[in-house]
Amino acid sequence: MAKLKLDIVTAERSVFSEEVDLVVAPGIEGEMAILPHHAPLMTALQAGELKAKIGSEEYSMVVSGGFLEVRPDRVIVLADSAERAEEIDIARATEAKKRAEARMADKYEPGMLAAETEASLRRAMIRLKVAEKRRKRPSV
């Protein structure tokens, strides 16, 4: 069966680099599935869960923005930030969520700060969701 080379990188490090069967990414128009021999494309990513399947194993990562380039045999993700599910610090993500919720409750926060706070809350919730899914599954 044909495979795709998936590379996920940030400015600081390479997060994931493997041959995979399927990539599911959070594009700005919604979730997109990419199989080998997909038509070339380039798109922006929104904060969300990025999944990669290798056989019956599924790997989850959290990406916070960036770009995704698809070639027929390769997917390259240049992410603003990215972390594998097993790297997520649940206590830190829970604290970030609480801080964002407290800021959201502040009705005097100007519009731009409110948008940043919503984005922070969304990232924290995604990180917690991905970490929780990993805890419920057997180790990969």
Swiss-Prot record:
It is found in: Cell membrane. Its main location: membrane. Keywords: ATP synthesis, Cell membrane, CF(1), Hydrogen ion transport, Ion transport, Membrane, Transport. It comes from the Bacteria. One of its GO terms (cellular component) is proton-transporting ATP synthase complex. SUPFAM superfamilies: Epsilon subunit of F1F0-ATP synthase C-terminal domain, Epsilon subunit of F1F0-ATP synthase N-terminal domain. Pfam families: ATP-synt_DE (PF00401), ATP-synt_DE_N (PF02823). HAMAP family: ATP_synth_epsil_bac. Produces ATP from ADP in the presence of a proton gradient across the membrane. This is ATP synthase epsilon chain. It comes from Dehalococcoides mccartyi (strain ATCC BAA-2266 / KCTC 15142 / 195).
